[in-house]
């Protein structure tokens, strides 16, 4: 007797359902894709008991004839393709012919449809894949599919479904992804007979604001690029909107939602140092690509794709996003960090929170450029005048030379002498008492008046950004600027510290350190980089080694980038250091001459803006 037999169709369908129908959201996805392929201009979804009791979708597409309806629940029956060659030029979302057969085999399935020219609709009911009723019904053109009691005959699968909140969250995310991809379609969603949304217009901003928060769309950076190989359009978020989850990162290929590690990594790399640990940027990106360049027949769920030339796509997407991101003014408005953290905490505690309209006003005001913010700052400054004789000591002359021409010419990245910033003179005039429109707050923050309100700068991370970019430039160009010590310093290192020292020794020399090994784990410091303060040589070197090790453990950084971050962090002026007016002006000018003045090398914000509009609201003027 043969031991290998062909499985019955009902068993094969249940096995197939295990791949295609993993949870109620899988049913929603498959039915929505069929409705879109049918040319629907309106889609209505009704969900009950998180899809366990009911998933119903009504569309006004072209409908089906009764013979087609009987065939559509058979395995590998489809109207989308008729040959393998058509997979290369596929223009529809569905094509495998498995979904309806799989869904009907594990549910009480009802299909009602009416196509153009039919006198009446027909109704077919299935239980566990078996046809139990055929009848006539009244209906407009289109198709209605109802899936009840999902997994009623597969109790093991039903047992592993999550809570209603979790399952409905997956359903909502599925509908959200499709509603954003097809703004020309009217969408309506009901959950347990409660209407959650009804999009009647094709306004993308309306949908973005609903799904992500009021005025959210105004805070996005629009991307629109096209070449002979691909088109890329959509939106990415400003760093003030960054979150620690990837739910708000949506990628599409030819309007098909996909999951792709390469695209996610390209996005992360495009933001680079704007991100702190575990942050992810918002993205809604649509890639248009020749269908022959991508294989979507990788997995039954059709979320994974395989590119013919993945490296080429990455090399095109990365610079487009990077260029768009770096041109923006990323200084967040006051209060945003707290609002986002509070919203993230609420979302983590209750997944349904993300389904409601968020009640924050603006994550990071409408996009503007770095130049706009700097010009706004400069326009509010009084004319530069010479300081009163003797008022700021000898260091003032250095700052006067540095600052005088800065408002009449384009600034280029350069570095001021750090020793000047660190010099303290109690005889200097207090900036708060002058008419400079620049003040130091608690010896931590620099407050500047700008056209739209106030700009607050964290002096430590601002200086850190300046030193970081200077360090990177010096190491890359191999033009160290070393100061020789009159009395060399000797430092004893631990074993692990000495190993790291040996690893980064060449780049320390590029940076301006003149170092010599002196016996077992002993290092002689004979010269230091320009920005190291006299008397702190040994401490700074040891702190840099410690910081380098911490960065290496937590972050995946290239060696020079790690060293530059360690150097800038340990050498920057500290919170609590009193600065003169000229020192603050110099720091601001040097900051805005950097590539990215809005975040420090570790991703912390450098600048916060407080608009007049916000102040007026706080005081009840608006």
UniProtKB/Swiss-Prot annotation:
Q: Which domain of life does this protein belong to?
A: Bacteria
UniProt cross-references to CDD domains, sorted A to Z: HATPase_MutL-MLH-PMS-like, MutL_Trans
One GO BP on record is: mismatch repair
Q: Does the keyword DNA repair apply?
A: yes
Cite a GO CC annotation: mismatch repair complex
Tell me the keywords, alphabetical order.
DNA damage, DNA repair
Any matching Pfam family: HATPase_c_3
GO MF term set: ATP binding; ATP hydrolysis activity; ATP-dependent DNA damage sensor activity; mismatched DNA binding
| Record-stated family | Belongs to the DNA mismatch repair MutL/HexB family.
PANTHER family referenced in this protein's UniProt entry, alphabetically: DNA MISMATCH REPAIR PROTEIN MLH, PMS, MUTL, DNA MISMATCH REPAIR PROTEIN MLH1
Role according to the record: This protein is involved in the repair of mismatches in DNA. It is required for dam-dependent methyl-directed DNA mismatch repair. May act as a 'molecular matchmaker', a protein that promotes the formation of a stable complex between two or more DNA-binding proteins in an ATP-dependent manner without itself being part of a final effector complex.
Q: Which NCBIfam families match?
A: mutl (TIGR00585)
Under what name is this protein listed?
Answer: DNA mismatch repair protein MutL
Q: Source taxonomy lineage?
A: Bacteria, Pseudomonadati, Chlorobiota, Chlorobiia, Chlorobiales
